């Protein structure tokens, strides 16, 4: 009986060591959030890659789905018009969030995906009306100077800066084919933050 118990505990320990090794190897934290309001549903799938040795702390990929049954039906029957067209453009949104820690508030004037240096980039605010999003070509990095009046300040604590980059469905399909994600962020101070990691996107049903 003791031998059975011993080997049972040993098997569990081996499994846990393997599990945590795989988690560390992949370095990806997955989270799924489902929110319902009336008959509508919002589903966020969130993939977080953690970095340890630089001011760039996290790369977060988010796939957001908005499901509105009434408009979902219209989309299926190929309806047109402002609401139907806006829903088609916004029902699934792909986004990267880059989290950079510093003692200053940062702006980011450029984002470069290696292999797609000629990508078409927009720089409008994320809260503009949906017709702007219908015109999204490759990706949007937001207004790099929105917090310009604070750029000169230095703080005695860590400032957690987040750069949100919304990407089009077409551009998402392109980067999903890459073996590695090589991305460079350039701040308002011309500091470069480089990412070179295995492309985890093809591993998931996105």
From Swiss-Prot:
One family name in Pfam for this protein: BPTA
Signal peptide: 1-19
GO CC, alphabetical: cell outer membrane
Function: Virulence-associated protein essential for survival of the bacterium within the tick host and therefore within the natural life cycle of the Lyme disease spirochete.
Subcellular location: Cell outer membrane
Record gene name: bptA
Family stated for the protein in its record: Belongs to the BptA family.
Keywords of this entry: Cell outer membrane, Membrane, Plasmid, Signal, Virulence
Coiled-coil residue windows: none
Superkingdom of the source species: Bacteria
InterPro entries in UniProt: BptA (IPR031471)
Phylogenetic placement of the source organism: Bacteria, Pseudomonadati, Spirochaetota, Spirochaetia, Spirochaetales
Protein's name in the database: Protein BptA
């Amino acid at each position: 009986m003791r031998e059975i118990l011993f080997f049972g505990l040993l098997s569990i320990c081996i499994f846990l060591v393997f599990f945590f090794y795989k988690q560390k190897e992949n370095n990806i934290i997955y989270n799924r959030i489902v929110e319902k309001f009336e008959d509508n549903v919002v589903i966020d799938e969130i993939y977080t890659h953690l970095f340890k040795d630089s001011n760039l702390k996290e790369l977060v990929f988010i796939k957001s789905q908005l499901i509105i049954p009434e408009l979902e039906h219209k989309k299926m029957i190929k309806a047109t018009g402002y609401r139907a067209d806006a829903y088609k453009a916004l029902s699934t949104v792909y986004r990267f969030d880059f989290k950079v820690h510093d003692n200053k508030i940062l702006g980011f004037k450029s984002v470069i995906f290696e292999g797609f240096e000629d990508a078409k980039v927009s720089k409008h605010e994320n809260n503009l009306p949906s017709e702007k999003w219908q015109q999204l070509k490759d990706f949007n990095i937001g207004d790099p100077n929105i917090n310009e009046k604070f750029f000169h300040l230095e703080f005695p604590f860590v400032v957690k800066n987040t750069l949100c980059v919304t990407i089009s469905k077409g551009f998402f399909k392109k980067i999903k084919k890459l073996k590695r994600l090589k991305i460079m962020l350039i701040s308002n101070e011309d500091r470069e933050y480089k990412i070179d990691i295995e492309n985890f996107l093809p591993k998931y049903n996105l």
